[in-house]
Protein backbone atom coordinates (compact mmCIF):
# COMPACT_ATOMS: atom_id res chain seq x y z
CA UNK A 1 0.00 0.00 0.00
CA UNK A 2 2.45 2.60 -1.21
CA UNK A 3 1.93 6.20 -0.18
CA UNK A 4 -0.67 5.80 2.56
CA UNK A 5 -0.38 8.05 5.60
CA UNK A 6 -2.09 6.06 8.33
CA UNK A 7 -1.05 6.99 11.84
CA UNK A 8 -1.54 4.18 12.71
CA UNK A 9 -2.22 1.71 9.91
CA UNK A 10 -4.45 -1.17 11.02
CA UNK A 11 -4.72 -4.50 9.20
CA UNK A 12 -8.13 -6.20 9.32
CA UNK A 13 -9.14 -9.80 8.56
CA UNK A 14 -9.13 -10.52 4.84
CA UNK A 15 -6.09 -8.36 4.11
CA UNK A 16 -7.85 -5.02 4.46
CA UNK A 17 -6.13 -1.88 5.72
CA UNK A 18 -7.65 1.07 7.60
CA UNK A 19 -5.51 4.10 6.83
CA UNK A 20 -5.46 7.62 5.32
CA UNK A 21 -4.36 9.13 2.01
CA UNK A 22 -2.57 12.24 3.20
CA UNK A 23 -2.46 15.34 5.35
CA UNK A 24 -3.54 18.94 5.16
CA UNK A 25 -0.81 21.54 4.67
CA UNK A 26 1.01 22.27 7.92
CA UNK A 27 0.68 26.00 7.19
CA UNK A 28 -2.94 25.93 8.29
CA UNK A 29 -3.25 23.25 10.96
CA UNK A 30 -1.40 20.47 12.76
CA UNK A 31 -1.60 16.78 11.78
CA UNK A 32 -4.98 17.00 10.04
CA UNK A 33 -5.56 13.83 8.01
CA UNK A 34 -7.45 14.26 4.74
CA UNK A 35 -9.61 11.18 5.18
CA UNK A 36 -9.94 7.74 6.73
CA UNK A 37 -10.19 4.92 4.19
CA UNK A 38 -10.44 1.15 4.14
CA UNK A 39 -8.63 -0.46 1.22
CA UNK A 40 -8.48 -4.06 0.08
CA UNK A 41 -5.37 -6.09 -0.72
CA UNK A 42 -5.19 -4.56 -4.21
CA UNK A 43 -5.50 -0.98 -2.98
CA UNK A 44 -9.16 -0.48 -3.91
CA UNK A 45 -11.09 1.84 -1.57
CA UNK A 46 -14.07 0.02 -0.06
CA UNK A 47 -14.98 2.63 2.60
CA UNK A 48 -14.21 6.30 3.13
CA UNK A 49 -14.89 9.12 5.57
CA UNK A 50 -13.94 12.74 4.98
CA UNK A 51 -17.05 14.80 5.76
CA UNK A 52 -16.04 16.31 9.08
CA UNK A 53 -15.41 19.82 7.77
CA UNK A 54 -15.16 21.58 4.41
CA UNK A 55 -11.72 23.19 4.25
CA UNK A 56 -10.92 26.08 1.91
CA UNK A 57 -7.30 27.00 2.61
CA UNK A 58 -5.72 29.87 0.61
CA UNK A 59 -4.29 28.76 -2.71
CA UNK A 60 -5.55 25.18 -2.31
CA UNK A 61 -8.78 23.84 -3.86
CA UNK A 62 -11.51 23.46 -1.24
CA UNK A 63 -12.40 19.95 -0.15
CA UNK A 64 -14.05 17.95 2.60
CA UNK A 65 -11.63 16.64 5.21
CA UNK A 66 -11.86 14.19 8.07
CA UNK A 67 -9.21 16.17 10.01
CA UNK A 68 -8.46 12.79 11.57
CA UNK A 69 -5.35 12.29 13.68
CA UNK A 70 -3.62 9.55 15.69
CA UNK A 71 -6.34 6.90 16.04
CA UNK A 72 -9.53 5.23 14.82
CA UNK A 73 -11.43 2.07 15.80
CA UNK A 74 -13.81 -0.12 13.82
CA UNK A 75 -16.80 -1.73 15.50
CA UNK A 76 -16.15 -5.30 16.61
CA UNK A 77 -12.66 -4.61 17.96
CA UNK A 78 -12.12 -2.36 20.96
CA UNK A 79 -8.42 -1.68 20.39
CA UNK A 80 -7.74 -2.38 16.73
CA UNK A 81 -5.42 -5.26 17.60
CA UNK A 82 -6.08 -8.99 17.72
CA UNK A 83 -8.08 -10.41 20.60
CA UNK A 84 -9.87 -13.78 20.36
CA UNK A 85 -13.53 -13.37 19.45
CA UNK A 86 -13.22 -9.61 18.89
CA UNK A 87 -12.57 -9.10 15.19
CA UNK A 88 -13.21 -5.73 13.51
CA UNK A 89 -16.00 -5.65 10.94
CA UNK A 90 -14.87 -5.26 7.35
CA UNK A 91 -18.11 -4.77 5.40
CA UNK A 92 -20.32 -2.94 7.90
CA UNK A 93 -20.27 -1.31 11.31
CA UNK A 94 -19.48 2.08 12.76
CA UNK A 95 -16.04 3.64 13.07
CA UNK A 96 -14.76 5.91 15.85
CA UNK A 97 -12.50 8.62 14.48
CA UNK A 98 -10.27 10.91 16.53
CA UNK A 99 -10.32 14.27 14.76
CA UNK A 100 -9.77 18.02 15.08
CA UNK A 101 -11.98 21.08 15.08
CA UNK A 102 -10.99 24.63 15.91
CA UNK A 103 -12.62 26.00 19.05
CA UNK A 104 -12.87 28.98 21.39
CA UNK A 105 -13.20 28.53 25.14
CA UNK A 106 -12.35 31.47 27.43
CA UNK A 107 -12.24 29.07 30.41
CA UNK A 108 -9.08 27.63 28.87
CA UNK A 109 -7.53 30.56 26.97
CA UNK A 110 -8.44 33.59 24.89
CA UNK A 111 -6.46 32.03 22.04
CA UNK A 112 -7.86 29.77 19.35
CA UNK A 113 -7.69 26.09 20.29
CA UNK A 114 -7.00 23.05 18.14
CA UNK A 115 -9.58 20.89 19.87
CA UNK A 116 -9.79 17.10 19.89
CA UNK A 117 -13.14 15.62 18.94
CA UNK A 118 -14.32 12.03 18.72
CA UNK A 119 -16.67 11.22 15.86
CA UNK A 120 -18.72 8.07 15.45
CA UNK A 121 -19.26 7.47 11.75
CA UNK A 122 -21.63 4.92 10.21
CA UNK A 123 -20.97 2.79 7.13
CA UNK A 124 -22.53 5.49 4.93
CA UNK A 125 -20.00 8.05 6.17
CA UNK A 126 -22.46 10.01 8.29
CA UNK A 127 -21.55 11.32 11.76
CA UNK A 128 -23.98 9.83 14.29
CA UNK A 129 -22.30 10.89 17.58
CA UNK A 130 -19.59 13.33 18.61
CA UNK A 131 -17.67 14.50 21.67
CA UNK A 132 -15.67 17.72 22.11
CA UNK A 133 -12.75 17.79 24.55
CA UNK A 134 -12.81 21.50 25.43
CA UNK A 135 -16.39 21.25 26.71
CA UNK A 136 -15.18 19.05 29.60
CA UNK A 137 -12.29 21.20 30.85
CA UNK A 138 -13.90 21.71 34.27
CA UNK A 139 -14.00 17.93 34.84
CA UNK A 140 -10.25 17.42 34.35
CA UNK A 141 -8.98 18.73 37.68
CA UNK A 142 -6.32 21.25 36.66
CA UNK A 143 -4.83 23.22 39.54
CA UNK A 144 -4.60 27.02 39.47
CA UNK A 145 -0.94 27.14 38.36
CA UNK A 146 -1.44 24.89 35.33
CA UNK A 147 -4.65 26.79 34.45
CA UNK A 148 -2.73 30.05 34.40
CA UNK A 149 -0.06 28.57 32.16
CA UNK A 150 -2.71 27.16 29.81
CA UNK A 151 -4.38 30.54 29.60
CA UNK A 152 -1.11 32.19 28.57
CA UNK A 153 0.07 29.43 26.24
CA UNK A 154 -2.17 26.47 25.35
CA UNK A 155 0.75 24.77 23.53
CA UNK A 156 0.73 27.39 20.79
CA UNK A 157 1.42 26.38 17.18
CA UNK A 158 2.09 29.18 14.62
CA UNK A 159 -0.39 28.21 11.90
CA UNK A 160 -1.92 30.64 9.40
CA UNK A 161 -3.85 32.92 9.41
CA UNK A 162 -4.11 32.69 13.20
CA UNK A 163 -2.09 30.46 15.48
CA UNK A 164 -3.77 27.78 17.59
CA UNK A 165 -3.16 25.93 20.83
CA UNK A 166 -2.84 22.14 20.56
CA UNK A 167 -3.82 22.17 24.21
CA UNK A 168 -4.64 18.50 24.92
CA UNK A 169 -3.19 16.50 22.00
CA UNK A 170 -5.13 13.27 22.48
CA UNK A 171 -3.17 10.51 20.76
CA UNK A 172 -5.17 7.36 21.47
CA UNK A 173 -8.84 6.50 21.74
CA UNK A 174 -10.59 3.16 22.15
CA UNK A 175 -13.76 1.59 23.49
CA UNK A 176 -13.54 -0.28 26.80
CA UNK A 177 -15.60 -3.26 25.67
CA UNK A 178 -16.81 -6.02 28.02
CA UNK A 179 -14.83 -6.01 31.25
CA UNK A 180 -14.86 -7.48 34.75
CA UNK A 181 -15.23 -4.11 36.47
CA UNK A 182 -18.58 -3.38 34.82
CA UNK A 183 -19.67 -6.98 35.39
CA UNK A 184 -19.04 -6.37 39.10
CA UNK A 185 -21.32 -3.31 39.02
CA UNK A 186 -18.90 -0.42 38.45
CA UNK A 187 -20.73 1.89 36.01
CA UNK A 188 -17.60 3.92 35.31
CA UNK A 189 -16.43 1.12 33.06
CA UNK A 190 -19.54 0.64 30.91
CA UNK A 191 -18.48 -1.34 27.79
CA UNK A 192 -19.52 1.55 25.52
CA UNK A 193 -17.35 4.07 27.35
CA UNK A 194 -14.22 5.40 25.69
CA UNK A 195 -10.69 5.76 27.08
CA UNK A 196 -8.36 8.49 25.78
CA UNK A 197 -5.09 10.06 26.80
CA UNK A 198 -3.88 13.63 26.34
CA UNK A 199 -0.10 13.81 26.14
CA UNK A 200 0.17 17.60 26.56
CA UNK A 201 -1.73 17.44 29.87
CA UNK A 202 -0.30 14.15 31.22
CA UNK A 203 -3.85 12.86 31.68
CA UNK A 204 -5.72 9.61 30.95
CA UNK A 205 -9.50 9.55 31.27
CA UNK A 206 -12.62 7.56 30.45
CA UNK A 207 -15.65 9.20 28.82
CA UNK A 208 -19.23 8.11 29.32
CA UNK A 209 -20.67 7.37 25.89
CA UNK A 210 -24.14 8.16 27.24
CA UNK A 211 -23.42 11.54 28.85
CA UNK A 212 -20.01 12.62 27.54
CA UNK A 213 -18.80 13.21 31.08
CA UNK A 214 -15.52 11.93 32.48
CA UNK A 215 -16.12 8.89 34.70
CA UNK A 216 -12.51 7.98 35.62
CA UNK A 217 -9.16 9.72 35.31
CA UNK A 218 -5.48 9.54 36.19
CA UNK A 219 -3.65 12.89 36.15
CA UNK A 220 -3.04 15.69 35.42
CA UNK A 221 -1.99 15.96 39.10
CA UNK A 222 -0.01 13.05 40.53
CA UNK A 223 0.39 14.49 44.04
CA UNK A 224 -3.26 14.43 45.08
CA UNK A 225 -3.58 10.85 46.36
CA UNK A 226 -1.37 8.07 47.74
CA UNK A 227 -2.31 5.90 44.75
CA UNK A 228 -1.29 8.52 42.18
CA UNK A 229 1.96 9.17 44.04
CA UNK A 230 2.75 5.44 44.01
CA UNK A 231 2.11 5.21 40.25
CA UNK A 232 4.31 8.26 39.71
CA UNK A 233 4.14 10.98 37.10
CA UNK A 234 2.94 9.79 33.72
CA UNK A 235 4.50 12.15 31.17
CA UNK A 236 3.79 12.63 27.47
CA UNK A 237 2.11 9.22 27.32
CA UNK A 238 0.73 7.29 24.35
CA UNK A 239 -1.68 4.47 23.53
CA UNK A 240 -3.57 4.17 26.82
CA UNK A 241 -6.19 1.45 26.41
CA UNK A 242 -8.04 -1.24 28.33
CA UNK A 243 -6.78 -4.75 27.63
CA UNK A 244 -9.59 -6.70 25.87
CA UNK A 245 -11.36 -9.14 28.17
CA UNK A 246 -10.34 -12.19 26.12
CA UNK A 247 -6.63 -11.52 26.67
CA UNK A 248 -4.46 -12.03 29.77
CA UNK A 249 -4.82 -9.01 32.04
CA UNK A 250 -8.22 -8.16 30.57
CA UNK A 251 -9.72 -5.05 32.18
CA UNK A 252 -6.40 -3.53 33.19
CA UNK A 253 -5.12 -0.40 31.46
CA UNK A 254 -1.91 -0.41 29.45
CA UNK A 255 -0.07 2.83 28.75
CA UNK A 256 3.28 3.75 27.23
CA UNK A 257 4.53 6.38 29.68
CA UNK A 258 7.02 8.09 27.40
CA UNK A 259 8.71 10.49 29.74
CA UNK A 260 10.36 13.26 27.77
CA UNK A 261 8.30 16.38 28.32
CA UNK A 262 4.63 17.09 28.96
CA UNK A 263 2.07 18.83 31.11
CA UNK A 264 1.34 22.34 32.32
CA UNK A 265 2.54 23.85 35.60
CA UNK A 266 4.21 26.91 37.05
CA UNK A 267 7.44 27.82 35.24
CA UNK A 268 10.59 25.93 36.24
CA UNK A 269 14.19 25.79 34.95
CA UNK A 270 13.35 23.00 32.50
CA UNK A 271 10.16 24.69 31.31
CA UNK A 272 10.52 28.48 31.58
CA UNK A 273 6.98 29.11 30.27
CA UNK A 274 5.36 26.32 32.30
CA UNK A 275 4.48 24.37 29.13
CA UNK A 276 5.85 20.81 28.98
CA UNK A 277 6.72 21.27 32.63
CA UNK A 278 7.31 17.64 33.67
CA UNK A 279 10.55 16.13 32.43
CA UNK A 280 12.05 12.62 32.53
CA UNK A 281 14.67 10.97 30.32
CA UNK A 282 13.32 7.41 30.26
CA UNK A 283 10.13 5.54 29.43
CA UNK A 284 7.88 3.04 31.22
CA UNK A 285 5.24 0.58 30.04
CA UNK A 286 2.62 0.30 32.77
CA UNK A 287 -0.27 -2.09 33.37
CA UNK A 288 -2.63 -0.47 35.87
CA UNK A 289 -5.56 -1.89 37.81
CA UNK A 290 -8.02 1.02 37.31
CA UNK A 291 -10.06 0.21 40.43
CA UNK A 292 -7.25 -0.32 42.93
CA UNK A 293 -5.21 2.33 41.06
CA UNK A 294 -2.07 0.23 41.33
CA UNK A 295 0.62 -0.88 38.90
CA UNK A 296 0.28 -4.65 38.49
CA UNK A 297 3.00 -5.09 35.84
CA UNK A 298 5.59 -2.85 34.29
CA UNK A 299 8.53 -2.70 31.93
CA UNK A 300 10.94 0.08 32.84
CA UNK A 301 14.71 0.56 32.55
CA UNK A 302 15.06 -1.46 35.76
CA UNK A 303 13.25 -4.49 34.28
CA UNK A 304 15.31 -4.01 31.12
CA UNK A 305 18.45 -4.49 33.20
CA UNK A 306 19.68 -0.89 33.23
CA UNK A 307 20.82 0.90 36.38
CA UNK A 308 18.34 3.68 37.12
CA UNK A 309 18.49 6.60 36.83
CA UNK A 310 22.08 6.71 35.54
CA UNK A 311 21.48 4.41 32.56
CA UNK A 312 17.71 4.77 32.26
CA UNK A 313 17.70 6.52 28.90
CA UNK A 314 18.61 3.24 27.22
CA UNK A 315 14.85 2.52 27.27
CA UNK A 316 13.45 5.82 26.08
CA UNK A 317 11.11 7.08 23.41
CA UNK A 318 10.02 10.66 24.16
CA UNK A 319 7.23 10.58 21.58
CA UNK A 320 4.94 8.16 19.66
CA UNK A 321 5.14 4.45 20.80
CA UNK A 322 2.68 1.89 22.18
CA UNK A 323 2.17 -1.71 23.21
CA UNK A 324 -0.10 -4.71 22.61
CA UNK A 325 -1.03 -7.54 24.96
CA UNK A 326 -0.65 -10.86 23.16
CA UNK A 327 -2.72 -14.04 23.66
CA UNK A 328 0.28 -15.83 25.21
CA UNK A 329 0.48 -13.21 27.96
CA UNK A 330 3.52 -11.49 26.50
CA UNK A 331 3.55 -7.80 25.58
CA UNK A 332 4.63 -6.38 22.23
CA UNK A 333 6.26 -2.99 22.82
CA UNK A 334 6.91 -0.27 20.24
CA UNK A 335 9.80 1.94 21.36
CA UNK A 336 8.86 4.29 18.57
CA UNK A 337 11.52 6.98 18.29
CA UNK A 338 14.18 4.35 17.56
CA UNK A 339 11.97 2.13 15.39
CA UNK A 340 12.32 -0.76 17.83
CA UNK A 341 9.60 -3.38 18.31
CA UNK A 342 10.13 -6.17 20.82
CA UNK A 343 8.17 -8.84 22.69
CA UNK A 344 8.69 -9.41 26.41
CA UNK A 345 7.39 -12.15 28.69
CA UNK A 346 5.64 -11.38 32.00
CA UNK A 347 9.04 -11.80 33.70
CA UNK A 348 10.60 -9.29 31.27
CA UNK A 349 12.61 -11.61 29.04
CA UNK A 350 12.93 -10.41 25.44
CA UNK A 351 11.87 -13.23 23.10
CA UNK A 352 11.50 -11.35 19.78
CA UNK A 353 12.92 -8.09 18.47
CA UNK A 354 12.94 -5.98 15.32
CA UNK A 355 14.53 -2.62 14.53
CA UNK A 356 13.18 -0.84 11.47
CA UNK A 357 15.84 -0.23 8.80
CA UNK A 358 13.66 2.35 7.03
CA UNK A 359 14.18 6.10 7.39
CA UNK A 360 11.83 8.87 6.34
CA UNK A 361 12.58 11.27 3.52
CA UNK A 362 11.71 14.50 5.33
CA UNK A 363 12.34 13.27 8.88
CA UNK A 364 15.59 11.25 8.73
CA UNK A 365 14.65 8.85 11.51
CA UNK A 366 13.55 5.21 11.56
CA UNK A 367 10.72 6.06 13.96
CA UNK A 368 7.73 3.72 14.07
CA UNK A 369 4.44 5.16 15.30
CA UNK A 370 2.78 1.98 16.51
CA UNK A 371 3.26 -1.68 15.51
CA UNK A 372 0.64 -4.44 15.67
CA UNK A 373 0.93 -8.20 15.48
CA UNK A 374 -1.91 -9.92 13.62
CA UNK A 375 -2.65 -13.61 12.98
CA UNK A 376 -1.32 -15.04 9.74
CA UNK A 377 -4.92 -15.94 8.89
CA UNK A 378 -5.87 -12.25 8.71
CA UNK A 379 -3.80 -11.92 5.53
CA UNK A 380 -4.71 -15.02 3.47
CA UNK A 381 -3.07 -13.52 0.37
CA UNK A 382 0.36 -14.30 1.85
CA UNK A 383 1.55 -17.86 2.49
CA UNK A 384 2.14 -18.64 6.15
CA UNK A 385 5.89 -18.54 6.74
CA UNK A 386 7.94 -21.12 8.58
CA UNK A 387 8.93 -19.71 11.95
CA UNK A 388 12.58 -20.27 12.85
CA UNK A 389 13.95 -19.75 16.33
CA UNK A 390 17.15 -17.71 16.57
CA UNK A 391 19.56 -17.94 19.47
CA UNK A 392 20.12 -14.45 20.88
CA UNK A 393 23.63 -13.03 20.75
CA UNK A 394 25.52 -12.52 23.99
CA UNK A 395 26.66 -8.95 23.36
CA UNK A 396 29.11 -9.13 26.25
CA UNK A 397 31.19 -11.79 24.48
CA UNK A 398 30.32 -11.34 20.78
CA UNK A 399 33.20 -10.35 18.52
CA UNK A 400 33.20 -9.35 14.87
CA UNK A 401 35.43 -11.40 12.53
CA UNK A 402 39.08 -10.48 12.96
CA UNK A 403 38.68 -8.99 16.44
CA UNK A 404 40.72 -10.20 19.40
CA UNK A 405 39.22 -13.10 21.31
CA UNK A 406 37.13 -12.26 24.34
CA UNK A 407 39.31 -11.92 27.42
CA UNK A 408 42.52 -11.73 25.41
CA UNK A 409 44.90 -9.48 27.35
CA UNK A 410 48.60 -8.82 26.95
CA UNK A 411 49.10 -8.97 30.71
CA UNK A 412 47.12 -8.78 33.95
CA UNK A 413 48.68 -7.98 37.33
CA UNK A 414 47.40 -7.30 40.83
CA UNK A 415 48.34 -4.20 42.83
CA UNK A 416 48.86 -4.68 46.55
CA UNK A 417 46.40 -2.89 48.82
CA UNK A 418 43.60 -2.23 46.28
CA UNK A 419 40.11 -2.33 47.82
CA UNK A 420 37.12 -3.40 45.66
CA UNK A 421 34.09 -1.21 45.06
CA UNK A 422 31.15 -1.78 47.39
CA UNK A 423 27.76 -1.26 45.80
CA UNK A 424 26.63 1.95 44.12
CA UNK A 425 28.40 4.27 46.59
CA UNK A 426 31.04 4.57 43.91
CA UNK A 427 28.60 6.61 41.81
CA UNK A 428 27.88 10.34 41.92
CA UNK A 429 24.10 9.74 41.83
CA UNK A 430 22.04 7.50 44.10
CA UNK A 431 20.34 4.65 42.27
CA UNK A 432 16.64 3.92 42.68
CA UNK A 433 17.64 0.78 44.60
CA UNK A 434 19.39 2.78 47.34
CA UNK A 435 17.32 2.99 50.54
CA UNK A 436 15.94 6.39 51.48
CA UNK A 437 15.91 7.85 54.96
CA UNK A 438 12.27 7.79 55.98
Predicted segments — roles?
Residues 1-438:
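Histidine-/acidic-rich catalytic cores in large beta-rich domains
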Amino acid sequence: WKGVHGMPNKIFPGGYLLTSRGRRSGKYSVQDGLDVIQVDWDGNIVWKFDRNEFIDDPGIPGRWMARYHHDFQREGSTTGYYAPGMEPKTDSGNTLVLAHRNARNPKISDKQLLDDVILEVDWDGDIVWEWHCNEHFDEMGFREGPKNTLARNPNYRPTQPEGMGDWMHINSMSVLGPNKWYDAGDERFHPDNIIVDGREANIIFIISKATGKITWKLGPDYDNSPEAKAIGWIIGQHHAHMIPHTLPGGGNILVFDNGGWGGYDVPNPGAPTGVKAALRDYSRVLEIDPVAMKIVWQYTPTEAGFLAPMDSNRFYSPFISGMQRLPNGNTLITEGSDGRVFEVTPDHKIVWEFVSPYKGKFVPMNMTYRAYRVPYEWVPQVAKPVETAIEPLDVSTFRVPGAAAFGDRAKEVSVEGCVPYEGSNALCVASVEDPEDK
